[in-house]
Design a protein with these regions (language model features):
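Kelch-like beta-propeller repeat domains
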Residues: 1-439
Length: 439
């Protein structure tokens, strides 16, 4: 791929934007190697910022118009970079014009922050560190429409750690599900925190999380010592409680998760110690109905510290990264079992955009065999987190070759932005997804 995909985002242009650090000399310091990889054509292109900016170790999320918002990043030091030193810069990348625009400064420096997009199109920035041992405790809010940044009130102030695992759930709150042993909820409207239930296992340092199909339940797996255990939290319950699910075949830290069109979850990469020791090269597929993890075909490269994984519109999974070893600059693509069960359904004449609370229609010659219609948001992944990833199944009806689906009205379930539209047949085989913008 030319560079190492330490950060990776799937864009609605079919490019994957990825970036890594550059270090070692005054001429390259405070810069990053930024490139795009087109998954359809295999073409790699340069996408560097036109100004000196180190976006390595930043947080990022996709905006409603498909641009990428990047907050914080790495230090300004000359020579080898020092971990933990944050910056206040943030930027927006436009995949159509392939342009970069600086945005207003964050309220405090951030290294290893987490971004979360909101139903109103704004973005919140949580956590990270200002400098080694000094936490970034405030919450910043970026409004892309007005291009303004503000820091929320003192009730939002809390130490949440580096790259906290955060997910927007259907009641409008944001769940923090790692890496400490206690979960928390943040209310964006009231801008305040409330405590949530403790995890069964306790602290899952460098564990993986995934927002499951429907966007109301969170899975967390691995992390810690490491552990093979996994657990889930259904936030729709009156009194949510973490409950154990099936254990992984392999204990692992530093892994990434991908929610597939059939609703199953792939955990990929990781290893049995930080950072590059005893890699686990066998992905596992989790069935939410049974709680069972099944080993899959191994990948060739180690995918531990600084690795990434993303669902592609054709239902395959791109895995890349880990910043050492002979295969660091090579990506691999995994084909899940559903791609070996026969022909795909097809989607013809999909809408370019839909409105929440409305309907979407498309034509499919295989409409009678369609068992699921699902919108899956583009992923934006780094350091075992992907707050953009969400899968929302739609209620639908079939009439002849026409499929009509209801689009949820709640922005908490379906935040604005670009989604992949999948039709999945009764064998679990997904179509290739067109892009649909949810307004």
């Amino acid at each position: 791929m030319g560079g190492v995909a330490i950060h990776a985002t799937l864009l609605h242009t079919d490019d994957v934007l990825f970036f890594q650090y550059v270090e070692g000399s005054p001429t390259t310091d405070h810069t990053s190697l930024v490139q795009t990889y087109n998954w359809r054509t295999g073409v790699v292109s340069q996408a560097a910022t036109p100004y000196r900016r180190d976006i390595f170790c930043a947080g990022h999320n996709l905006l409603p118009d498909g641009r990428l918002f990047i907050a914080g990043g790495h230090d300004h030091n000359t020579g080898k970079k020092q971990d933990g030193i944050g910056v206040r810069e943030s930027d927006v990348y436009d995949p159509i014009g392939r342009t970069w625009t600086p945005t207003p400064l964050l309220g405090e420096p951030r290294w290893y922050p987490t971004n979360v997009g909101l139903p109103n199109g704004k973005s919140l920035i949580f956590g990270g560190t200002q400098s080694p041992g000094v936490a970034a405790r405030t919450v910043d809010e970026y409004d892309a429409v007005t291009n303004t940044m503000r820091t929320l009130g003192s009730a939002a102030t809390k130490t949440v750690g580096q790259y906290p695992r955060m997910h927007l759930v259907p009641d409008g709150r944001i769940l923090k599900s790692g890496t400490s042993g206690t979960s928390w909820f943040f209310d964006p409207v009231g801008a305040r925190w409330t405590s949530g239930p403790s995890m069964v296992y306790g602290s899952r340092s460098r564990g993986a999380t995934a927002l499951l199909e429907g966007a109301g339940t969170v899975l967390t797996a691995g992390g810690g010592a490491p552990t093979r255990t996994a657990e889930v939290l259904d936030t729709s319950q009156a009194t949510p409680r973490w409950r154990s699910t099936g254990s992984l075949t392999y204990a692992r830290v530093l892994s990434n998760t991908v929610v597939l069109p059939d609703g199953q979850v792939l955990i990929i990469g990781g290893g049995q110690a930080f950072k590059y020791t005893n890699p686990v090269k066998v992905p596992e597929l989790w069935n939410p109905s049974t709680g069972i993890w099944s080993p899959m075909a191994p990948h060739q490269a180690s995918r531990m510290y600084h690795a990434t994984a993303l669902l592609l519109p054709d239902g395959r999974v791109l895995c890349a990264g880990q910043d050492n070893g002979p295969l660091a600059r090579f990506a691999e693509i995994f084909s899940p079992p559903y791609l070996f069960r026969g022909a795909r359904p097809t989607i013809v004449d999909p809408p370019a955009s839909v409105t929440r609370g409305g309907q979407l229609r498309f034509t499919s010659a295989e409409a009678v065999s369609v068992a699921k219609v699902v919108l899956i948001r583009s992923g934006s992944n780094t350091h075992e987190i992907n707050t953009d990833q969400r899968s929302v199944p739609l209620v639908f009806a079939v009439s002849g070759t026409t499929v009509t689906a209801d689009v949820p009205s709640s922005g908490n379930t379906l935040p604005p932005g670009y989604y992949m539209l999948f039709a999945v047949n009764s064998l679990g085989v997904p179509s290739t997804a067109p892009w649909v913008r949810v307004l």
